[in-house]
Amino acid sequence: MKTLSILDTIIKIPEKIEIHPTTTEYIYTITGPLGSSSINLKKLDKNGIACINFDIQNKQVLIRSLYPKYNGLYKKLIENKFLGVSRGFCVYLEIVGVGYRAALLSSSLQNSTKDTNDTIVLKLGHSHDIHYKVPNGVRVFLQSPSEICIFGVDLNQVTQVAHSIRNTRPPSVYKGKGIRYTNEKIVTKTGKRK
């Protein structure tokens, strides 16, 4: 009979990062030089497979589980939170196509005073311009009218915004025109031959 052994994984908390428990039992706030992010342990481990313990005095996180693959998963997710509040995450998009371009409307230039989010105006060959409102916690920079940089503290939110912008005009399989990730390779098809 196979015996199960408990595997422990220890993550050291970096110096400039502070962790504070909130009023809710399973939610912790991670604060760093770039801002703060929260982690919900109940949402992270829905099935109760692992025991995740934040030891704030010793500046470490202890993950204890019977399954090593879950230890690696939870370790990577927590390290991504630490990396996000200390360095941040960037995703680069490029727009390919004649006349395709993006413009950024800053929230200070818009008429509404309640709105604090920037808006990206995309000209992608449609009969109308596409306005994409950037959510809170994410910043968008235009390096040129055809290059978009998406920056934020939460990796999940940054990649979700990048995917939403890319889906407004995904790359064409025949000519490759559209919005793509900077290092993405588009496999194009050949057209019909007569």
Curated annotation (Swiss-Prot):
GO biological process, one term: cytoplasmic translation
Pfam family, one: Ribosomal_L6
Keyword Phosphoprotein set for record: no
Mitochondrion in keyword set: yes
Cellular localisation: Mitochondrion
InterPro entries membership: Ribosomal_uL6-like, Ribosomal_uL6-like_a/b-dom_sf, Ribosomal_uL6_a/b-dom, Ribosomal_uL6_bac-type, Ribosomal_uL6_CS
SUPFAM superfamilies membership: Ribosomal protein L6
GO CC, alphabetical: mitochondrion; ribonucleoprotein complex; ribosome
PROSITE patterns (UniProt xref): RIBOSOMAL_L6_1 (PS00525)
Superkingdom assignment: Eukaryota
Record key words, sorted: Mitochondrion, Ribonucleoprotein, Ribosomal protein
GO function terms (MF aspect): rRNA binding; structural constituent of ribosome
Family, as annotated: Belongs to the universal ribosomal protein uL6 family.
Protein name in UniProt: Large ribosomal subunit protein uL6m
